């Protein structure tokens, strides 16, 4: 039996599980695990990952040095980086100039400070190479900011914040204040891996190299492929939201077409792309305005860029806080596009990532089925995560499994990200074995190797050691990924031929720009409402009742289950109710105020009843959902 080399270890995913409970129950056999995989069982795809989550923190740092990217003063302050006296003096001088640009701004206080600091930069290469005395400490802090917590709990908000730190590098802008990057300076970088990568990047940029004129994005793709090559991965599908943006998408596609043949020649790794559609608008970027009709624009751009053989599908992404059936009109239009114009185009929906919307897995399949006209063939589709759904042992669950089998849909599992984002704390009922046993096609993804500090081998080891997949079950997963690999090869050849016919000798940018404008213009005439939603903005409906929280008192927050999933009921414990009464009795209403959830039941009701019983005069505030019915 041939094995891929490994060792005995406590995986980071286990450390995360330990951090989530005081009552850790996994035995030694699942805690201290053997880190090898039988070669015949090794999976060779990553079919669920994201563009700005692939590269390791060290690789992003190396790219920041090579491309001399701007690094904001805000992050220097935020993670407490150390500058030389000369660097500090210069950046403060630069800040004064930026401050003058905002002297008439409507912003004030911390918001104005943040705005100024966000737009005051140091050359990242300068920060590291001309500050070697602080490089080891600074690199350690920067590295920590670029990956999700490994040994502790995290939530979706942590994920969004890490993405912001990564955007400085992944979407970086070169500094105007370039420095000379000397080999002796590179040799002083205290981290060997970063040092090696910077040297290779400099070598790649030599005039005789085929990568001499690589853009930042092209370098990212090159290093993503090199990393996958080390992992034994041969086919990857990456979700990228830039592929749904007007003009930007065409620019990205030009870079992809130029670099990918070179990358495949060197690494034998084939990378293809899914156009990412946000299920809700992105709000974490303060200055990024999302068009009210962004879904319409996304669809029109996808229909433009999907002419390219490198665009193999679409992906509904983002935090799963809404019912997927709200997006039925969008799904319908994509399905009709796939069926009528782009046979083989894959529709992926993130569903079942957390337990708040367990019906989304089944509803996602129904949305696709309901999009078909009589006689039309089911398009290729995959579900990302699929962790939570109806009880698979129930009649409804059996119907779901049968529906997956009949439609040929596939489910992608990412164990590490589910544990890291606190969406999974118990492995006993993980559904993958049930799906495989019942003939549902299952695949593996990483959700972003660099983001979670893992690779595809780590992910497969987790399925082996923690979920207990057998060689026979891995063989079935290999059969599913082989189906994807074979389809991707045939699809690329067919689509590449059609793309050349579409271009008809024209420049790619010109041809796609014309088509983009035609599609956008046609889209303006389409009056179909793309989001079905009966929910109302709580901020508007409750505007008469909304008040700012007191600044002169201390909040006491009592979370009693208001935001539980629908099927979870809060049962009031008598001892806990007595403790709450004692707490409320001892609190001084002149110094504190109470904060509870919006449902006047469970412990929230106990709080209100106790305050009334004790005749206390507390200010009580309730957090409410953003949307209400």
Question: Residue ranges of each PLM-predicted region?
Answer:
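Metal-cofactor-binding active-site regions of metalloenzymes
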Residues: 2-533
């Amino acid at each position: 039996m041939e094995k891929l080399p490994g060792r005995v270890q406590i995986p980071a995913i286990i450390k995360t599980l330990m951090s989530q409970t005081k009552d850790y129950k996994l035995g030694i056999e699942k805690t201290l695990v053997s880190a090898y995989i039988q070669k015949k069982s090794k999976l060779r795809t990553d079919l669920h990952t994201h563009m700005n989550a692939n590269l390791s923190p060290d690789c992003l740092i190396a790219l920041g040095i090579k491309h001399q990217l701007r690094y904001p003063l805000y992050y220097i302050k935020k993670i407490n980086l150390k500058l030389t006296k000369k660097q500090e003096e210069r950046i403060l001088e630069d800040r004064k100039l930026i401050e003058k640009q905002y002297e008439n701004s409507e912003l004030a206080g911390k918001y104005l400070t943040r705005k100024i600091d966000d737009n005051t930069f140091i050359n990242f290469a300068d920060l590291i190479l001309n500050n070697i005395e602080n490089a080891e400490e600074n690199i350690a802090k920067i590295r920590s900011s670029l990956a999700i917590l490994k040994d502790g709990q995290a939530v979706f908000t942590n994920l969004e914040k890490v993405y912001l730190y990564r955007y400085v590098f992944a979407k970086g802008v070169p500094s105007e204040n370039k420095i000379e990057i000397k080999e002796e300076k590179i040799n002083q970088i205290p981290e060997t891996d970063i040092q090696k990568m910077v040297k290779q990047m400099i070598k790649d940029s030599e005039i005789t190299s085929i990568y001499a004129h690589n853009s930042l994005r092209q370098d990212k793709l090159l290093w993503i492929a090199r990393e996958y090559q080390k992992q034994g991965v041969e086919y990857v599908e990456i979700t990228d939201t830039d592929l749904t943006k007007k003009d930007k998408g065409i620019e990205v596609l030009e870079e992809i077409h130029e670099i990918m043949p070179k990358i495949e020649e060197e690494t034998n790794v084939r990378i293809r792309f899914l156009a990412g559609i946000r299920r809700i608008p992105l709000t974490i970027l303060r200055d990024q305005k999302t068009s009210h009709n962004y879904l319409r624009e996304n669809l029109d751009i996808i229909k433009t860029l999907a002419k390219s053989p490198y665009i193999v599908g679409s992906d509904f992404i983002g935090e799963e806080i809404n019912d997927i059936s709200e997006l039925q009109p969008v799904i319908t239009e994509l399905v009709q596009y796939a069926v009528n114009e782009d046979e083989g185009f894959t529709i992926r929906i993130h569903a079942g990532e957390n337990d708040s919307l367990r019906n989304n897995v089944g509803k996602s399949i129904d949305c696709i089925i309901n999009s078909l006209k009589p006689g039309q063939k089911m398009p290729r589709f995959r579900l990302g995560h699929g962790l939570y759904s109806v009880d698979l042992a129930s009649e409804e669950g059996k119907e779901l499994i049968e529906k997956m089998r009949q439609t040929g849909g596939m489910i992608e599992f990412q164990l590490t990200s589910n544990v890291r984002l606190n969406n999974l704390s118990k492995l006993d009922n993980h559904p993958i074995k049930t799906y495989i046993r019942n003939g549902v096609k299952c695949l593996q993804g990483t959700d972003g190797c660099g983001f979670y500090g893992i690779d595809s081998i780590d992910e497969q080891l987790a399925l082996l050691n923690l979920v207990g997949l057998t060689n026979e079950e891995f063989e079935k997963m290999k059969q599913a990924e082989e189906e994807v690999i074979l389809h991707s090869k045939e699809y690329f050849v067919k689509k590449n031929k059609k793309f050349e016919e579409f271009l008809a000798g024209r420049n790619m940018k010109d041809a796609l720009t014309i088509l983009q404008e035609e599609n956008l213009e046609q889209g303006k005439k389409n009056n179909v409402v793309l989001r079905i939603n009966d929910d109302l903005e709580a901020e508007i409906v409750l505007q008469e009742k909304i008040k700012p929280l007191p600044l002169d008192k201390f909040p006491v927050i009592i979370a009693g289950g208001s935001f539980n999933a629908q099927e979870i009921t809060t049962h009031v414990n008598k001892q806990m109710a007595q403790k709450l009464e004692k707490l409320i009795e001892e609190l001084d209403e002149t110094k504190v105020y109470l904060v509870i959830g919006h449902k006047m039941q469970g412990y929230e009701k106990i709080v209100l009843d106790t305050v009334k019983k004790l005749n206390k005069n507390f200010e009580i505030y309730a957090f409410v959902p953003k949307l209400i019915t």
